[in-house]
């Protein structure tokens, strides 16, 4: 009989692979941003909250750099404020936990609660895109939603084998959020404008010349009062 520990280790390894795939899933988005030199309506929220370990920290730092380079001033300011707030918050948490919690159990509880909160935000952040309002899934990548679902499902199973509430809650909610995203994608996929539709150009219509006739009085030089004035027709061609 296979031991629960072995199953848990296997699920954990698979979870690590899927997590790595989760961090790499936005690569097509940022390749598009680099090519177009514009972030358009893509959001930085998932990147700002997903930096949860060493490998992802490096990957997400690259994403943030690309997003920052091609953002407008408003987005750059927002990112700067959020990153500065995160840095100050993490410093405050570290100092507070080290000085205020004197046992390993209490420190684990405090940090675990924070991990639950930020893990939940990580999964729910793509929902900040106004899919329902715009009736478009253009800025909610399908790959990110699929990998989020697989990642949350795998880590939920991992946490349930040997119950860990701090892993179960955020990843269980992550599965629900990912399902919601996939449902939204299925609903609004057909109403999303295709890229080729956006690039359609109206046919060029050749300008049509218009002939306009103007009747103007022609005066007689010998008649100052114009009593003997005659009329002449002048044809004017107008090119638009």
Curated annotation (Swiss-Prot):
- Tell me, in one coarse class, where this protein mainly resides: membrane
Q: Which residue ranges run through the membrane?
A: 13-33, 47-67, 79-99, 109-129, 141-161, 165-185
SUPFAM superfamilies, A to Z: MFS general substrate transporter
Q: Which Pfam families match?
A: MtN3_slv
* One GO CC annotation: plasma membrane
Residue ranges in the Cytoplasmic topological domain are 34-46, 100-108, 162-164
Q: Does the keyword Methyltransferase apply?
A: no
UniProt keywords (A-Z) are: Cell membrane, Glycoprotein, Membrane, Repeat, Sugar transport, Transmembrane, Transmembrane helix, Transport
Q: Which family does it belong to?
A: Belongs to the SWEET sugar transporter family.
Listed PANTHER family = RAG1-ACTIVATING PROTEIN 1, SUGAR TRANSPORTER SWEET1
Q: What is this protein called?
A: Bidirectional sugar transporter SWEET7c
Species per Swiss-Prot/TrEMBL record: Oryza sativa subsp. indica
